[in-house]
Amino acid sequence: FILAFRRSSRSCLILAFGYASFMMGTLYYLLHLIILGHGPQVFYVAECSWMASYFFFLSLEILYWEGLRPPFSPFALAAGVVIAGVVMRVQVFGPSPLMSGALALTFGTLAYLCFSALQKEKRLRPYEIALLFEMLLQILLFVVSEFIRDYTRFSLYYAVDILLTLTLVSFLPHILREEPHDLH
């Protein structure tokens, strides 16, 4: 937040809110695991925070397109539909069609915008690569969590979660490099 205000940067401020939202969901989930030894039984508390973070990451991508219209691309549309379909099939945020549908719509839109940028610029920006990788890791984390029941020892779940966190951290340097292009 301090960096966002020092630079008067909308993109840094949006990223800070995205980080804060993701951190709140993760903190709730981890405290529940540490204190009680199992995943939360009150569903969608952490998921709502994580969902808010993806809305902020979507806002960053929309900020990139501010004043421009993404070109229509059948490839980008297909990528968005496939990612949304995978999220719905795997039910990343649990059995609720509402939460899984909201995440599927958000991930599909993010994928569409990222691949539209690929069509426009003939390359993906580093932030978009990290964002697509982060979405893949979020899906993988849910799939892995279906097979892990013992959270007391280091497992594949924690390896994927650490990689997901490091990918989130990588957003900041990518955004700072694009700062001259930030429309503020």
Predicted feature residues:
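Internal transmembrane alpha-helix with an interfacial aromatic "cap," most often the third helix
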Residues: 1-8, 30-77, 114-115, 171-179
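Extracellular-loop-to-transmembrane junctions of the mid-late helices
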Residues: 81-119, 153-160
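C-terminal transmembrane-bundle signature of multipass membrane proteins
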Residues: 110-184
